[in-house]
Amino acid sequence: MASFGWKRRIGEKVSKATSQQFEAEAADEKDAAENEDGNWLQASKRRKETLQEGCKQRSQQLKDEGAQLAENKRYKEAIQKWDEALQLTPGDATLYEMKSQVLLSLHEMFPAVHAAEMAVKRNPHSWEAWQTLGRAQLGLGEIVLAIRSFQIALHIYPMNPELWKEDLSWARKLQEQQKVAQRIENKEMPPEGPDLSPGSIPDYDFESDEIVAVCAAVAEKQKSVSANKTMVIVSASGTVEIVNEKEEGSSTPDGSVFIKAR
């Protein structure tokens, strides 16, 4: 008769050497997975760098093509090339600055100012961008802003004779002319006040009943005032007396006794 006994665990049958082999294989698989992850990250980084480098090269190619078109005065086509380049490298301040110059040649002042502002925003240390911005602002008549832009450009590159002799000097000359024109305009402007020109005086009908009645009332009042005159007489003792006298037959008191004051 077979005796009853507890079943042994399966793991107890696995030898120690076999267990170590399993652990080693698991570690190798883990290292391989980590290596694969690392390789994937490195490969992704390399692909990104390659893509960026390709974008830069293509952008530079489009920039050069646009510059060639601009030299041949094919401005619209040049702008299209630079817009394509900006899609690849949106942080390139030079593209915005070149685009602003071409827009100035096309007399599109507002877009030119906007493009120059974008160039300054991308690279505030570019004196070319500040110079182009100042010229675009002059095109809009913003002389004060243009002078400020030229001064910033000179602060970055103080040895540039073009900024001194052409840009800043011309802007200041325009500013002086603007001040003279304003002074002349202020002198020629008529003073504010009621308009007394002949055209502003209403044409009254002096033979109307209303005007005749008013004139008669004024004449009657003047007649009554001239008929009676009032005199204030102050005696030597200081007594004040008011006397109404007629125009005809009036007599003046003795000057030795009274002092007459009107």
Swiss-Prot record:
SMART domains linked: TPR
Modified sites of kind Phosphoserine: S197
Regions that span the bilayer: none
Keywords associated with the record: Phosphoprotein, Repeat, TPR repeat
Region named Disordered: 17-63
SUPFAM superfamilies named in the record: TPR-like
Record's keyword annotation contains Protein transport: no
TPR repeats: 59-92, 93-126, 127-160
Gene3D superfamilies per the UniProt record, alphabetical: Tetratricopeptide repeat domain
Name recorded for this polypeptide: Tetratricopeptide repeat protein 33
Organism encoding this protein: Mus musculus
